């Protein structure tokens, strides 16, 4: 089986940075324990990234995943997830007697602060994203009153837009660039003027999606590897499938639909921004063995 593997597949800068910060806390805790000091408890606030294998590995190291601020105990070292958290939660975390390490992706943090600045200037946010995604919940916390979220142009068309309101447009950092531009054009037509835009979709997302599209146009089938909870991975699968090629999204090689793939001559392989290289490698080896 011939496999074309995306060069952009695997960890992005934000994920790598978040995991390095968490690893550093784990290493420091182990060093202190080796010196005879009590081992401090390490936790993340929410899953550090959206990948089940990575989360399982950290759980095996004793890293806890907290969901509520009141779960934080004195002396805990708490690492904020790569997706960021609502600013009210971050403030509450920092009020606890704990060490708080912010592992929010720099691109997400920039989006948070940009949204806050626009809202302070009197504009109202229109956010293209998944309403229940943790990054989106965090972004909205910087937006104040009146912010509106939409996950598609169809949803945008159904929003109660007010002609007298000064809007600005932003997106979840891992959103589909093409769909974002369609939304931007629709707003221009609907409101009769260009809406100010925050360019919050990160370059890594844009490059990954474009490479997935390019590969999908050359192959008989497309395999996208990454957590089912990962929004950026789901969108890679979406943009690949939109090219008319059979596309499958799996978390590891054991989930591959072997019989459907066996007759393919060329298979494309890409992966989400939170997928470890080891899983991508294992998937590639399995595909090449078919």
UniProtKB/Swiss-Prot annotation:
Record's cofactor remark: Binds 1 [4Fe-4S] cluster per subunit.
What EC number(s) does its UniProt record assign? Answer: 1.17.7.4
Gene Ontology terms describing biological process? dimethylallyl diphosphate biosynthetic process; isopentenyl diphosphate biosynthetic process, methylerythritol 4-phosphate pathway; terpenoid biosynthetic process
Which amino acids does the record list as binding (2E)-4-hydroxy-3-methylbut-2-enyl diphosphate? 50, 83, 133, 173, 230, 232, 274
Q: Name one GO molecular function term.
A: 4 iron, 4 sulfur cluster binding
* Gene3D superfamilies found in the cross-reference section: 3.40.50.11270, 4-hydroxy-3-methylbut-2-enyl diphosphate reductase, catalytic domain
Keyword field contains Ligase: no
Pathway it works in: Isoprenoid biosynthesis; dimethylallyl diphosphate biosynthesis; dimethylallyl diphosphate from (2E)-4-hydroxy-3-methylbutenyl diphosphate: step 1/1; Isoprenoid biosynthesis; isopentenyl diphosphate biosynthesis via DXP pathway; isopentenyl diphosphate from 1-deoxy-D-xylulose 5-phosphate: step 6/6
The active site consists of 135
Q: Which residues does the record give as isopentenyl diphosphate binding sites?
A: 50, 83, 133, 230, 232, 274
Cofactor names from the entry are: [4Fe-4S] cluster
Supply the CDD domains for this chain: lytB_ispH (cd13944)
Q: Which InterPro entries match?
A: LytB/IspH (IPR003451)
Catalyzed reactions per annotation: isopentenyl diphosphate + 2 oxidized [2Fe-2S]-[ferredoxin] + H2O = (2E)-4-hydroxy-3-methylbut-2-enyl diphosphate + 2 reduced [2Fe-2S]-[ferredoxin] + 2 H(+); dimethylallyl diphosphate + 2 oxidized [2Fe-2S]-[ferredoxin] + H2O = (2E)-4-hydroxy-3-methylbut-2-enyl diphosphate + 2 reduced [2Fe-2S]-[ferredoxin] + 2 H(+)
Binding residues annotated for dimethylallyl diphosphate, in chain numbering: 50, 83, 133, 230, 232, 274
Residue positions annotated to bind [4Fe-4S] cluster are 12, 105, 202
Domain of life of the native organism: Bacteria
Q: Which UniProt keywords apply?
A: 4Fe-4S, Iron, Iron-sulfur, Isoprene biosynthesis, Metal-binding, Oxidoreductase
* Keyword Magnesium (UniProt): no
* HAMAP family, sorted: IspH
Relate the protein's function as given in its record: Catalyzes the conversion of 1-hydroxy-2-methyl-2-(E)-butenyl 4-diphosphate (HMBPP) into a mixture of isopentenyl diphosphate (IPP) and dimethylallyl diphosphate (DMAPP). Acts in the terminal step of the DOXP/MEP pathway for isoprenoid precursor biosynthesis.
**Family to which this protein belongs:** Belongs to the IspH family.
**What is the name of this protein?**
4-hydroxy-3-methylbut-2-enyl diphosphate reductase
Q: What is the lineage of its organism?
A: Bacteria, Pseudomonadati, Thermodesulfobacteriota, Desulfovibrionia, Desulfovibrionales
Q: Which gene encodes it?
A: ispH
